[in-house]
Swiss-Prot record:
Entry protein name: Arginine--tRNA ligase
Description of how the protein assembles with itself and partners: Monomer.
GO cellular component, one term: cytoplasm
Any Pfam family matching the protein: Arg_tRNA_synt_N
Record CDD domains: ArgRS_core
Catalytic reactions of this protein: tRNA(Arg) + L-arginine + ATP = L-arginyl-tRNA(Arg) + AMP + diphosphate
Organism taxonomic ancestry: Bacteria, Pseudomonadati, Chlamydiota, Chlamydiia, Parachlamydiales
Gene name, Swiss-Prot/TrEMBL: argS
Family from the record: Belongs to the class-I aminoacyl-tRNA synthetase family.
Localization (cell): Cytoplasm
Keyword entries, A-Z: Aminoacyl-tRNA synthetase, ATP-binding, Cytoplasm, Ligase, Nucleotide-binding, Protein biosynthesis
PROSITE patterns documented for this protein: AA_TRNA_LIGASE_I
GO annotation terms (biological process): arginyl-tRNA aminoacylation
Class of this enzyme: ligase
Species for this entry: Protochlamydia amoebophila (strain UWE25)
Length: 584
């Protein structure tokens, strides 16, 4: 089943070609610009290309519009109305029969009438990526939930997705930490004493202070880095233990968030680094700057106008994240055979990734005509005071504490709303609502901007919130329970028949699900989907207000419209990483 947008695009492409045969010479790549109408009085969609065509064809825009409409008279079956407005806009309204039939297809098809791609792509998404021996904080929440929602989207659309956790698990920090633990926690290194991430974080902070202040400790830490790089057994065992403790703590968060991801840290790429540097040198891309091997790229300067370096080898012979990211992009293209690479990090790393992509192109690793690469930047999480979100003591909020607080807040709200609810059921609901509220609050903001974190706001049952959408789903589940309907039998014997204006509005919006997913897949903005779902819930509430379901001649057809709404709502929330519940 085609999207409504593509149905119209095909109609107008043909009508325009028939009306103006010379257009194929004047603009061989002409594509009609069609957008959803902003107001109900302008129909369902609007054709906006008449002005552009008028300039090309040297005609009056309204005459252009009239010529196109004249060619559409034989194509009216999907459309009930075509009107020319203003200087040449063409407003279109789909027939209720066409919409009803397409809703029947969506409702009965397991994949919503959305065709699977003829050639699925391999899409590699790099997200979350905390630094080992450090707590995950609210910034990691953004990368994690945005990355997970995009992965779920592409999986639903039928692509093969590899979810990678590019852990910061290598470098000087480990030398510092191992050297410090040898002095302060030898029993932990020997395996006699257990520890956790909280202790590792504390030791890391102390080791950093010591590294900055004590030259002798700095020397010992650097020796530990060398030992680690050379594969010495004791150093490797200490490193392995630190990684495992960190990953165990991260896994608790991923389980709470219902996020699946493959750990593949910086250390994975270590064997490839010397060859990458050598290859870049052979290709004449490397220049020596202050003893370091650097790549300088056009268009990347600092505030003083000096060229920014992509440093692929430090003056002491060591490697850094520039080298690792060059190795990673090479590996993802040549070893993983990725068709599309997506990196999700804070906006502060945008220049770094633009430079990596440009350098990969110059090195002939990346051919952007064959492989699409995207850096997906996101803004900061702010507190209600407008400053970077922190605890009351000024510390960065631990992500695990944030999630537990959201669950507890949701539990309190549910206790107040429904004191008779069984505790086990309430705790289950509180988890779905609390985690869902945090995810949705993040995803419903345009990721490029900053957003303000507020438990109170995100857990409200009104407005564009997870609770509002989850409650719309609960409402439909309640309708089905009250009617005790045999849904398979209703599906077999009844077809949707849109009559009332709010039925038509709801049905039209349901059928825009596919084109919404296409938009999100292209610009990687999850708020495309949250906006769609919020409008869906609002349109359902308007339908429910105006159109009685139970005990009317239209009971079964309206029940099917409720079911189509619930089906899309559930799938949309699943793509965002939220779970639906039948009761609340």
């Amino acid at each position: 089943m085609n999207t409504l947008l593509s149905v119209l695009a095909n109609l107008f492409q043909q009508a325009t070609a028939n009306a103006f045969p010379d257009l194929s010479v004047l603009d061989p790549n002409f594509q009609p610009e069609i957008t959803p109408s902003t107001q109900e009085k302008f129909g369902h969609y609007q054709f906006n290309s008449a002005m552009k065509l008028a300039k090309l064809l040297k005609k009056n825009p309204r005459q252009v519009a009239e010529a196109i409409v004249n060619q559409l008279t034989d194509s009216l079956p999907p459309l009930s109305k075509i009107e020319i407005a203003g200087p040449g806009f063409i407003n279109m309204t789909f027939s209720t029969d066409f919409l009803s039939k397409n809703l029947d297809i969506l409702l009965r098809d397991a994949h919503f009438g959305i065709p699977f791609p003829e050639k699925p792509e391999k899409i590699i998404i790099d997200f979350s990526s905390p630094n080992v021996a450090k707590e995950m904080h609210v910034g990691h929440l953004r990368s994690t939930v945005i990355g997970d929602s995009l992965a779920r989207l592409f999986e639903f659309l039928g692509h093969h997705v590899i979810r990678l956790n590019h852990l910061g698990d290598w470098g000087t920090a480990f030398g510092m930490l191992i050297a410090y633990m040898k002095e302060e926690a030898p029993n932990v290194l020997s395996g006699e004493q257990k520890t956790d991430l909280t202790h590792l974080v504390s030791w890391y902070r102390s080791s950093k202070k010591k590294f900055d202040e004590e030259p002798e400790f700095k020397r010992r830490a650097q020796l530990e880095v060398v030992a680690l790089q050379q594969g010495e057994q004791k150093a490797r065992e200490a490193w392995q233990m630190i990684c495992e403790i960190s990953q165990k703590a991260y896994q608790e968060i991923y389980q709470l968030l219902d996020v699946k991801i493959i750990d593949r840290g910086e250390s994975f790429y270590n064997p490839f680094l010397p060859n990458i540097v050598s290859d870049l040198e052979k290709k004449g891309l490397v220049k020596i700057s202050d003893g370091a091997k650097c790549i300088f790229l056009e268009g990347f300067q600092n505030r003083e106008g000096e060229n920014l370096p992509l440093m692929i080898q430090k003056s002491d012979g060591g490697y850094n994240y520039d080298t690792t990211d060059m190795a990673a992009i090479y590996h993802r293209i040549y070893h993983e055979k990725g068709d599309r690479l997506i990196y999700i990090t804070d906006a502060g790393q945008a220049t770094h990734f633009q430079m990596i992509f440009k350098a990969a192109e110059k090195a002939k690793y990346l051919d952007t005509t064959q492989i699409r690469v995207d850096h997906v930047p996101f803004g900061l999480v702010l507190g209600t005071d407008g400053k970077k979100f922190r605890t009351r003591s000024g510390e960065t909020e631990k992500l695990i504490d944030l999630l537990r607080t959201a669950i507890n807040c949701a539990d309190k709200i549910l206790s107040e709303k429904n004191p008779e609810m069984e505790e086990s059921e309430r705790r289950h609901l509180a988890k779905s609502l609390g985690i869902g509220a945090i995810k949705y609050a993040d995803l419903s903001c345009n990721r490029v901007g900053d957003y303000t974190f507020s438990y109170d706001r995100m857990l409200r049952f009104e407005g564009n919130t997870a609770a509002f959408l989850m409650y719309a789903y609960v409402r439909i589940a309640g309708i089905k329970r009250r009617l005790k309907a045999n849904l398979p039998a209703v599906l077999e014997n009844t077809h949707i028949n849109l009559e009332h204006s709010t039925e038509i509005e709801l049905g039209l919006h349901i059928l825009r699900f596919h084109e919404t997913l296409n938009l999100m897949a292209n610009d990687l903005l999850p708020n495309r989907l949250t906006d769609y779902l919020y409008t869906l819930a609002e349109k359902f509430n308007a339908f429910f207000r105006d159109c009685r379901v139970e005990g009317t001649p239209q009971q079964n057809t309206r029940l099917l419209l409720c079911e189509a709404t619930a089906k899309v709502l559930k799938q949309g929330l699943t793509i965002l990483g939220l779970t639906t519940v039948d009761k609340m």
